[in-house]
């Protein structure tokens, strides 16, 4: 089973802050790649209620089904490779580690349905302390900018992330994860 603990820190950015960081990190357009997240839950938001999220990510022509759920530190991610997914509306969770983990969470996998998609243009830059990720996301007629910092250790990562924000004079902003931002925007459109 492909599982990992994800420790990441996030902060929303203005478009100008995003451009400033990209420039300082010497990131050009060719460093950014497109990926698309397709989100799923039950009509009663059973996953959201458990602070979990289910997505299929299409990146570089490959599809990965990922379940994210809370862990003692960070998030536990369970991954499963998929062959091409052509019918998102009719998608059902295949046998494998993700379905097994959903059952452990007591989620009815037959009730899972497609909620929508979020497209992200992403660049990554490895540093001594962790991975800097710049995301420009588009979903439901909205766009936003975000910086993420992934680290192996929570305390060292937090310290490095705060230093990074200070370096660019960026205030810490409450930042929800992409799926929550997507759901909030979707709720506005209903």
Curated annotation (Swiss-Prot):
Molecular function in Gene Ontology: hydrolase activity
Enzyme Commission identifier(s): 3.6.1.-
Species of provenance: Bacillus subtilis (strain 168)
Residue ranges of domain CYTH in the record: 4-189
Stated name of the protein: Putative triphosphatase YjbK
PROSITE patterns, per database record: CYTH
Uppermost EC category: hydrolase
UniProtKB keywords: Hydrolase
């Amino acid at each position: 089973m492909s599982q990992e603990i994800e420790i990441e820190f996030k902060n929303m950015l203005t478009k100008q802050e995003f451009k400033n960081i990209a420039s300082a990190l010497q990131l050009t357009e060719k460093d950014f790649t497109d990926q698309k997240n397709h989100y799923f839950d039950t009509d009663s938001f059973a996953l959201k209620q458990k602070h979990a999220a289910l997505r299929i990510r299409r990146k570089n022509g490959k599809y990965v089904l990922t379940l994210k759920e809370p862990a003692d530190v960070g998030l536990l991610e369970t991954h499963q490779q998929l062959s091409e997914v052509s019918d998102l509306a009719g998608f059902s969770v295949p046998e494998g580690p993700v379905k097994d983990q959903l059952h452990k969470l007591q989620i009815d996998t037959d009730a899972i349905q497609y909620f929508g998609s979020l497209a992200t243009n992403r660049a990554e830059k490895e540093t001594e302390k962790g991975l800097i990720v710049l995301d420009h996301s588009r979903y439901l007629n909205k766009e936003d900018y975000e910086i993420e910092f992934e680290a192996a250790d929570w305390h060292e990562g937090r310290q490095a992330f705060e230093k990074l924000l200070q370096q660019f004079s960026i205030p810490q902003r409450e930042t929800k994860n992409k799926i929550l931002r997507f759901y909030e925007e979707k709720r506005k459109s209903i």
